[in-house]
Each structure stands twice: as C-alpha cells, then as structure tokens.
From Swiss-Prot:
Substrate binds at T12, A13, V14, G15, K16, T17. Residues 35-38 are annotated as: Interaction with substrate tRNA. Catalyzes the transfer of a dimethylallyl group onto the adenine at position 37 in tRNAs that read codons beginning with uridine, leading to the formation of N6-(dimethylallyl)adenosine (i(6)A). Its EC number is 2.5.1.75. It is an enzyme of class 2 (transferase). Transmembrane segments: none annotated. Keywords: ATP-binding, Magnesium, Nucleotide-binding, Transferase, tRNA processing. It catalyses: adenosine(37) in tRNA + dimethylallyl diphosphate = N(6)-dimethylallyladenosine(37) in tRNA + diphosphate. This is tRNA dimethylallyltransferase. It comes from Streptococcus pneumoniae serotype 4 (strain ATCC BAA-334 / TIGR4). The record marks T101, R127 as: Interaction with substrate tRNA.
Length: 294
C-alpha cells in the first residue's frame, strides 16, 4: 500500500509555507522542505525559511542540513526525503512536502523501487540530461526511439524515454507514494506585487548582511547561485547601486516564479488553487480531508 502524502507547490511568495503549516496543524503532520536552497545553514532570509517560531510549532525537515560550501543534488534530496517521509509515516503522522524546486519534487514523486541493476542516481542523471531539450527536440527523440505518446507533453515524453533507455526493469516498478499535489497560484499582477513586497521585507530583515556574508566567504559555491544572493553581488563589487541591485533581484524573482509555474503546469499533475479567491483555504483543507479518508 502506497503512503499518502500531501505536496504543496507553487511560485515563490505565493504562501506555500503558511499553508503547509496550517495543513500540518489540522491533520497531525510534519513539513518536509522541497527547496534546494533552504538546505543551507546561514541562508535564512533570502531563502524564506520558516521562522524559528513556525518551526517550533510544527516539525520541519530538510532545512539547515548542509554547510554553504557543500553541494546538494536532486539525488541527495530524494534519498533524504524518502528516509524522512518513512520516519514521519512510522510516527503515525502525515508528511507534507512544500517547496518550489520542481525537479526535486518531481524526482521524489516519480522515484521508483529499483530492484534491478539500475540505480536511482543513474535515472536522475539521465532525466537531468533531457532537461535542456525543447518540446520539439524531445518529440524528435521520441520519434527516433519508435515510441508513441498520445497527447504529447514533456512529462510523458521524458518518462517514455527513460523506460526505453533503461528497459522493462524500470517500467514495471511502482512509485512509492500516493500524492495529492496542490499548486497555489495568483493573478499575475498580484503575484508580482507579492514578490516585490517580500523582497522589500527581506531587506528590512537583514538580507543585505546575509548576502554580504556569503559574498565574503564563498561567492562561487552552489549555495551562492540561488536567486536572492547573486543579484546583490554586483552591488558589493561596486558595479551597481543598491537600488539597481534590489530591482535586479525583484526582476529575477518574478522571472523565476514564471518558470516555476510553467514547470508545475507542464510536468506535474497538480490541482490549481487561486489564493485570491474567497474561501480557498477551506476548499483545500476539504480536498485534503477527502483524500485522506478515501
């Protein structure tokens, strides 16, 4: 029997953390961060981690598990998330995955029991190799492999190519989880206003000092490549004014949010909820209750 989990995704600044905490309180759950940057110790403001008070109210996992000089991959996330979810389930609680790193969450949900000779790491590496291809290029690869995909989309194409590449050993495996995937969204103008406002609040909370610490200690590590830090480095080098760097950060974050939505829309089977609609949280909680009772 597959383990039921709740997955909350969506663009940055849309309210994933707040909803995850509410769901955890309502359904006796624990939150697993699905964010590639929140794993790093010391990067708190720019990654929008749950506050210490929020983490004290509801257990959070996969936050502050790496130093800024260490690397972190989709394979690391899947391996650690699987162990974390198993522990939550064994405690009789509900695992709630919340985050915006689509590749990590998709890899977790499409992770397979591999009893044959194909390690999960190889599958993730192959999947990552397909990411740069456009839809047209993927369709060409599918045709070359002699595969047929009704109602073509990226997720189906990549899955079919994985099966063709690794063979029946992969095709016959079952996924580990039964997920309910909720994707939060907002009207574009409203979302962009939320992003701009959150960046302003981050500066008030000390983002500049946090980014300067990263710039002084490890400007070239993987942790420094995330949105929220590298956009401020030109200011530290004297190449931009603070106002210019702030606007650059807001623009980069808005573009990132757009890419996130495209990912979730095209590559994952999600239920969309507009956060600006009346009663949306009650509808989400009702859907979760029905899912868990089914």
């Amino acid at each position: 029997m597959k383990t039921k989990i709740i997955v909350i995704v969506g663009p940055t600044a849309v309210g994933k953390t707040a909803l995850a905490i509410e769901v955890a309180k309502r359904f006796n759950g624990e939150v697993v961060s699905g964010d590639s940057q929140q794993v790093y110790r010391g990067l708190d403001i720019g990654t929008a981690k749950a506050s210490p008070e929020e983490q004290a109210a509801v257990p959070h996992h996969l936050i502050d598990v790496r130093e800024i000089t260490e690397s972190y991959s989709a394979f690391d996330f899947v391996s650690e998330a699987k162990m974390t979810i198993e522990g939550i389930h064994n405690r009789g609680k509900l695992a709630i995955i919340a985050g915006g790193t689509g590749l990590y969450i998709q890899s977790l949900l499409e992770g397979y029991h591999l009893g044959g000779e194909t390690p999960h790491e190889e599958i993730l590496a192959y999947r990552a190799s397909l990411e740069p291809y456009s839809d047209e290029e993927l369709a060409h690869l599918v045709d070359q492999a002699g595969l047929e995909i009704p109602q073509f989309n990226r997720r189906r194409a990549m899955r079919a190519l994985e099966i063709a590449h690794f063979g029946q050993d992969l095709e016959n495996q079952e996924t580990l989880y039964e997920p309910l995937i909720i994707c939060l969204d907002d009207e574009r103008s409203q979302l962009y206003e939320r992003i701009n406002h959150r960046v302003d609040l981050m500066f008030e909370a000390g983002l500049l000092d946090e980014a300067k610490w990263l710039f002084d200690h490890s400007p070239n590590v993987q942790a420094a490549k995330g949105i929220g830090y590298k956009e401020l480095f030109p200011y530290f080098r004297g190449e931009q004014t603070l106002e210019e760097a702030s606007e650059s950060l807001k623009q980069a974050t808005r573009r990132f949010a757009k890419r996130q939505l495209t990912w979730f829309r095209n590559r994952m089977q999600v239920t969309f909820y507009q956060i600006g609609e009346s009663g949306v949280q009650d509808r989400i909680l009702s859907q979760i209750e029905e899912f868990l009772d089914d």
